[in-house]
């Protein structure tokens, strides 16, 4: 390993509870965390420490599983086990709950904004993916409900530049969606993992998709042209990283600034992989660049790269804390 992860901060964010997710705002100056205590906490740096700026505790009745900032940074979406998604609007130093999106039958596992900020995707244990549209008056409308998975849907992620959506599920599959005639459809199903697919991340250009799974592998998928003129997407697995993780890989994040790939694992470890720039793009080679075996003393649930500062990585854990690391590639 030629790189290193250096711990910069460790913060008890959700005491006596799991910290499920940590998300940087688009400016890279603020963090949002969520947990089993039903709360969302907003964090800012003061001097050399991270301080809680506000607590959003009145939006959900159960665990908050995921938080996502809008591309403009003025809104925060939260997905909860109470089957709702809350949209929060930033007002000065506080946030107000603007609207509650209802419709899922069970726990909402993930929420994600499209790069345009005008579309939102949610997914749930009810096996469905919902696409929502937001207008200039902050009104949210469900455009489409897609039932392409046969089990709990764990994760949704948008392509960085296109209105293309990917989802990961307990059914071991990944689905790729595009809009067709005002309706959203599954255009490709990616099969290859042997167990639950927990998370997905696109590379900075959106040409490749990385997935992580309960089968302890990371797979890299690349869009390939079908050549038959059909409108369906075709994606193939061009690389599998195996033998690096001791337990389930819960999250994966591709750094937009450096191209480094980070993973969060049930063995309490955080790992960063770097790509060999000399390798064939159709057969990429990723090497383990940095590994902190006990990054947290319980499962690591999330890895999140700062969008503005290269190499700054946030992680969070079942022990209720989040940590900030500095990744140095060499």
Curated annotation (Swiss-Prot):
GO cellular component: cytosolic [4Fe-4S] assembly targeting complex
SUPFAM superfamilies: WD40 repeat-like
Positions annotated as WD repeat: 14-53, 59-98, 103-142, 148-187, 192-231, 244-283, 295-330
Pfam families, per database record: WD40 (PF00400)
Function recorded in the entry: Key component of the cytosolic iron-sulfur protein assembly (CIA) complex, a multiprotein complex that mediates the incorporation of iron-sulfur cluster into extramitochondrial Fe/S proteins.
Protein family (similarity comment): Belongs to the WD repeat CIA1 family.
Protein's UniProt name: Probable cytosolic iron-sulfur protein assembly protein ciao1
Upper taxonomic lineage: Eukaryota, Metazoa, Chordata, Craniata, Vertebrata
């Amino acid at each position: 390993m030629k790189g290193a992860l250096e711990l910069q901060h460790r913060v008890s964010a959700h005491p006596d509870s799991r910290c499920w997710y940590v998300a940087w705002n688009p400016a890279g100056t603020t963090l949002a965390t969520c947990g089993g205590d039903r709360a969302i906490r907003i964090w800012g740096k003061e001097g050399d420490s991270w301080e809680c700026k506000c607590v959003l505790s009145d939006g959900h009745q159960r665990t908050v599983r995921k938080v996502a900032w809008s591309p403009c940074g003025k809104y925060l979406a939260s997905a909860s086990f109470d089957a709702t998604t809350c949209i929060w609007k930033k007002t000065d130093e506080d946030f107000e709950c603007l609207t509650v999106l209802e419709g899922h039958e069970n726990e909402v596992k993930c929420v994600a904004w499209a790069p345009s900020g005008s579309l939102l995707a949610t997914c749930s244990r009810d096996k469905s993916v919902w696409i929502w549209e937001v207008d200039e008056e902050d009104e949210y409308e469900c455009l489409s409900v897609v039932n392409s998975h046969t089990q709990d849907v764990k994760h949704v992620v948008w392509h960085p530049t296109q209105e293309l959506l990917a989802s990961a599920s307990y059914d071991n599959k990944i689905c790729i969606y595009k809009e067709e005639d005002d309706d959203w459809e599954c255009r490709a199903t990616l099969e290859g993992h042997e167990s639950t697919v927990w998370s997905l991340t696109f590379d900075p250009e959106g040409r490749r998709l990385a997935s992580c799974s309960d089968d302890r592998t990371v797979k890299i998928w690349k869009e390939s042209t079908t050549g038959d003129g059909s409108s369906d997407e075709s994606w193939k697995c061009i690389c599998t990283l195996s033998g690096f993780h001791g337990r389930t890989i819960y999250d994966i994040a591709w750094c937009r600034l450096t191209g480094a790939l980070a993973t969060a694992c049930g063995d309490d470890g955080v790992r960063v992989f770097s790509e060999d720039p000399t390798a064939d793009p159709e057969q990429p080679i990723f090497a383990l660049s940095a590994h902190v075996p006990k990054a947290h003393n319980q499962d690591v649930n999330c890895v999140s790269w700062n969008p503005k500062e290269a190499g700054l990585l946030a992680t969070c854990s079942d022990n209720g804390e989040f940590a900030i690391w500095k990744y140095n590639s060499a």
